[in-house]
Amino acid sequence: MAAPAPGLISVFSSPQELGASLAQLVAQRAASCLEGNRGRFALGLSGGSLVSMLARDLPAATAPAGPASFARWTLGFCDERLVPFDHAESTYGLYRTHLLSKLPIPDSQVLTIDPALPVEDAAEDYARKLRQAFQGDTVPVFDLLILGVGPDGHTCSLFPGHPLLQEREKIVAPIGDSPKPPPQRVTLTLPVLNAAQSVIFVATGEGKAAVLKRILEDQESALPAAMVQPRTGALCWFLDEAAARLLSVPFEKHSTL
């Protein structure tokens, strides 16, 4: 079987330049979608360093569109830890504090888990919310998913060798044995990731260099992040120089200096 295509690789001189370009891309994608046939923009976010990156740059990047445009945004989360929203590990909680307070997206269009439910019920509840928001789609089709990648090659809460990598029926799955704490999580599955119109992986720092070489150069297709191959959508990688330092495959170098 042929190795999967790695997608377009863009390398930036610093995380700050990466973040500014990422925010502009999100704003451009939103504007394009709002002008298109569907008339809405569905964005899926991941946690980690992306929270501070988007909180710093996205409000200014989206400001020219005006506050009324956010009424047609739908925001979901690619995975979530089963913790209260005020917990330091809550992805939604961090975005609520640092980003959503600056963007007038209606609360009803921000799709979250119910952390009070058992993990299996929380996954089913989140799947129901997604199906309601994406009526007409057999599998929810996000306009843009922003994903991270761990040093082990995991993305969302899909970990190497885990049975969830074989899930084909559920759009959202519970995980009760995450090798990375906290152990109970809810995650989008590969069918949803691969149905997206656009997927951007974001990785910064030397700690990601080795796994990025495995994915993008050695093409280790069994790693979860390498299994994200949108069927009809675009796949891009946004890296800083430290994360890209081991790559010899072609990439686009960007700098605003």
Swiss-Prot record:
Q: Which SUPFAM superfamilies does the record match to this protein?
A: NagB/RpiA/CoA transferase-like (SSF100950)
Residue list for modification N6-acetyllysine:
180
Top class in the EC scheme: hydrolase
Q: Which residues carry this modification: N-acetylalanine?
A: 2
Keyword Iron-sulfur present in the record's keywords: the answer is no
Identify the metabolic or biological route this protein is part of.
Carbohydrate degradation; pentose phosphate pathway; D-ribulose 5-phosphate from D-glucose 6-phosphate (oxidative stage): step 2/3
Q: Name one Pfam family in it.
A: Glucosamine_iso
Give the EC number(s) under which this enzyme is classified. Answer: 3.1.1.31
List every position bearing Phosphoserine.
49
| Cellular component, GO, one term | cytosol
BP GO terms, sorted: carbohydrate metabolic process; pentose-phosphate shunt; pentose-phosphate shunt, oxidative branch
Q: Name one GO molecular function term.
A: monosaccharide binding
Q: Which domain of life is it from?
A: Eukaryota
Q: Where are the transmembrane segments?
A: none
- Catalyzed reaction equations: 6-phospho-D-glucono-1,5-lactone + H2O = 6-phospho-D-gluconate + H(+)
Keywords (A to Z) from UniProt: Acetylation, Cytoplasm, Hydrolase, Phosphoprotein
Subcellular localization is given as:
Cytoplasm
Q: What does this protein do?
A: Hydrolysis of 6-phosphogluconolactone to 6-phosphogluconate.
Family matches, as PANTHER family = 6-PHOSPHOGLUCONOLACTONASE
Similarity comment: family membership: Belongs to the glucosamine/galactosamine-6-phosphate isomerase family. 6-phosphogluconolactonase subfamily.
Give the protein's recorded name.
Answer: 6-phosphogluconolactonase
The species is Rattus norvegicus
